[in-house]
């Protein structure tokens, strides 16, 4: 099957799951505007996780092109990162990721067909891994190893990773004055 989803904003990611997400067959395009973007934890086919380096507006086209495929998606909401996978992707092959430009065909729920893409900006030409290939800054939350960004919580005075260090009592962040 085909799944195309864009987050609705407010910091939410397009994908959200409890402990694991196995990707096995089908087409997936999941675009996230916030910093909660998650990747498939166990892809059984090549998958791409890309950060655009900026927030793309709704209506922007995103293209994934290789020798054996040409997928174009139209964002239905803002996005700063996206996850893409399809059975046509192969480890070791090159995928060119572009955004912007125009598309001459139809767009049904974000998936474009029956036309051609032109005039976009090339974001990257990536050699695909057999599992997940990541590119760019994607703004993920820390903690879960399957989330984009893979940041860690800072260690604070209490040492539990949840309490930041520093004095916040003078009207700065969380000061309340």
Question: Which residues fall in each region the model found?
Answer:
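A composition-driven surface/loop motif
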Residues: 1-177
